[in-house]
Amino acid sequence: MGSLTKADLAENLVDSIGLSKKDAKDLVEGFFDVVRSSLIERQQVKLSGFGNFEVREKSQRPGRNPKTGEEIPITARTVVTFRPGQKLKSKVEDYMQE
C-alpha cells in the first residue's frame, strides 16, 4: 500500500471525469494553493464531509532529551492541524472493519 500523491489525484480526475491531464494537474494545484493561502492568512479551511484544517499556536513546554534524560524546553511554534469530520471517520472505520 503506497501513498496518494497530487499526481495520483490528477490522474483520478482524468479517469473519472475526463479532464485533460493539464487541466487536472492545474485543478489539483489550484486547490492546494487556495488551501495553503487560506491557512497562511490564518483562515480555517472546512471541507464538508471531510474535515477541517487550521493554524494553531503551541506554547512552549518542557521536554526531555530521550538519550540523556536532560530536560530541555520545546519552543513555542505555529502548526497546521487537521481534524477529520465525522463522515470521514465513519467511512474509514466502516472500511477497516470489513
From Swiss-Prot:
GO terms for molecular function: DNA binding; structural constituent of chromatin. It comes from the Bacteria. GO terms for cellular component: cytosol. Transmembrane segments: none annotated. SMART domains: BHL (SM00411). One of its GO terms (biological process) is regulation of DNA-templated transcription. Keywords: DNA recombination, DNA-binding, Transcription, Transcription regulation, Translation regulation. It holds the Pfam family Bac_DNA_binding. The keyword Transcription regulation applies. InterPro entries: Hist_DNA-bd, Histone-like_DNA-bd_CS, IHF-like_DNA-bd_dom_sf, IHF_alpha. This protein is one of the two subunits of integration host factor, a specific DNA-binding protein that functions in genetic recombination as well as in transcriptional and translational control. HAMAP family: IHF_alpha. Belongs to the bacterial histone-like protein family. This is Integration host factor subunit alpha. It comes from Marinomonas sp. (strain MWYL1).
